Amino acid sequence: MSTRSLVALQVGDHFESIYVHFDGYLKGVGQSLLKYTTYEQVADLLEGGDRSSLDRDSCYGDSDVLRVHRDLDELLAESSVFDYVYVFMDGEWYYVTSNTPLLKLRGAC
Protein backbone atom coordinates (compact mmCIF):
# COMPACT_ATOMS: atom_id res chain seq x y z
CA MET A 1 0.00 0.00 0.00
CA SER A 2 1.34 3.41 -0.88
CA THR A 3 1.13 6.70 1.00
CA ARG A 4 0.82 9.23 -1.79
CA SER A 5 2.32 12.70 -1.44
CA LEU A 6 2.87 15.87 -3.40
CA VAL A 7 6.09 17.84 -2.90
CA ALA A 8 5.88 21.50 -3.91
CA LEU A 9 8.13 24.54 -4.18
CA GLN A 10 7.10 28.19 -4.25
CA VAL A 11 8.55 29.76 -7.40
CA GLY A 12 7.76 33.46 -7.39
CA ASP A 13 3.99 33.81 -7.23
CA HIS A 14 3.18 30.22 -8.23
CA PHE A 15 4.03 26.68 -7.06
CA GLU A 16 5.59 23.72 -8.86
CA SER A 17 5.24 20.15 -7.61
CA ILE A 18 5.99 16.48 -8.15
CA TYR A 19 4.19 13.33 -7.06
CA VAL A 20 5.92 10.82 -4.75
CA HIS A 21 4.20 7.42 -4.70
CA PHE A 22 5.64 5.64 -1.64
CA ASP A 23 6.34 6.58 2.00
CA GLY A 24 4.56 9.95 1.92
CA TYR A 25 3.94 9.94 5.69
CA LEU A 26 5.76 12.30 8.07
CA LYS A 27 8.43 9.79 9.13
CA GLY A 28 9.09 8.92 5.48
CA VAL A 29 9.02 11.70 2.90
CA GLY A 30 8.52 14.30 5.64
CA GLN A 31 11.78 13.46 7.41
CA SER A 32 13.66 13.06 4.13
CA LEU A 33 12.63 16.53 2.99
CA LEU A 34 14.18 18.18 6.04
CA LYS A 35 17.65 17.67 4.55
CA TYR A 36 16.66 19.94 1.63
CA THR A 37 17.09 23.36 3.22
CA THR A 38 17.54 25.78 0.32
CA TYR A 39 15.51 26.81 -2.69
CA GLU A 40 18.21 25.42 -4.98
CA GLN A 41 18.25 22.01 -3.29
CA VAL A 42 14.47 21.68 -3.51
CA ALA A 43 14.45 22.84 -7.14
CA ASP A 44 17.06 20.16 -7.96
CA LEU A 45 14.92 17.52 -6.23
CA LEU A 46 11.85 18.46 -8.27
CA GLU A 47 13.78 18.66 -11.53
CA GLY A 48 13.57 14.90 -12.08
CA GLY A 49 9.77 14.86 -12.02
CA ASP A 50 7.48 12.33 -10.35
CA ARG A 51 9.19 9.65 -8.27
CA SER A 52 8.44 6.31 -6.71
CA SER A 53 10.38 7.28 -3.58
CA LEU A 54 12.65 10.05 -2.35
CA ASP A 55 15.16 7.54 -0.99
CA ARG A 56 15.93 6.04 -4.38
CA ASP A 57 16.73 7.76 -7.65
CA SER A 58 13.65 6.39 -9.35
CA CYS A 59 11.12 8.01 -11.60
CA TYR A 60 7.42 7.20 -11.44
CA GLY A 61 5.65 6.70 -14.71
CA ASP A 62 6.82 8.79 -17.60
CA SER A 63 6.21 12.26 -16.20
CA ASP A 64 9.21 14.52 -15.84
CA VAL A 65 7.02 17.60 -16.24
CA LEU A 66 6.36 19.60 -13.10
CA ARG A 67 2.79 20.38 -12.09
CA VAL A 68 2.17 24.12 -11.92
CA HIS A 69 -0.31 25.67 -9.46
CA ARG A 70 -1.35 29.33 -9.74
CA ASP A 71 -1.24 29.91 -6.00
CA LEU A 72 -1.23 28.23 -2.60
CA ASP A 73 -5.02 27.86 -2.58
CA GLU A 74 -4.97 25.93 -5.84
CA LEU A 75 -2.15 23.72 -4.57
CA LEU A 76 -3.91 22.99 -1.28
CA ALA A 77 -7.15 22.21 -3.09
CA GLU A 78 -5.39 19.03 -4.23
CA SER A 79 -4.69 17.94 -0.65
CA SER A 80 -7.74 15.66 -0.63
CA VAL A 81 -6.24 13.64 -3.51
CA PHE A 82 -2.98 12.98 -1.66
CA ASP A 83 -2.29 11.67 1.83
CA TYR A 84 0.25 14.48 2.39
CA VAL A 85 1.15 17.69 0.57
CA TYR A 86 4.58 19.15 1.43
CA VAL A 87 5.37 22.76 0.53
CA PHE A 88 8.72 24.58 0.63
CA MET A 89 8.17 28.34 0.87
CA ASP A 90 9.99 31.21 2.52
CA GLY A 91 12.88 28.86 3.39
CA GLU A 92 10.69 26.49 5.45
CA TRP A 93 8.87 23.19 4.93
CA TYR A 94 5.14 22.93 5.62
CA TYR A 95 2.66 20.11 5.21
CA VAL A 96 -1.07 19.55 5.04
CA THR A 97 -3.29 16.48 5.03
CA SER A 98 -6.95 16.17 4.12
CA ASN A 99 -7.88 16.80 7.76
CA THR A 100 -5.22 19.24 9.01
CA PRO A 101 -4.45 22.88 8.28
CA LEU A 102 -1.09 23.94 6.87
CA LEU A 103 1.50 23.10 9.55
CA LYS A 104 5.24 23.69 9.82
CA LEU A 105 7.26 20.50 9.28
CA ARG A 106 9.62 19.80 12.17
CA GLY A 107 12.24 17.14 12.85
CA ALA A 108 11.46 13.89 14.67
CA CYS A 109 7.84 13.78 13.54
Task: Annotate each predicted stretch with a short phrase.
Residues 15-16, 84:
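A generic secondary-structure signal marking the coil-to-beta-strand transition
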Residues 17-28:
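Short, solvent-exposed aromatic-acidic interface loops
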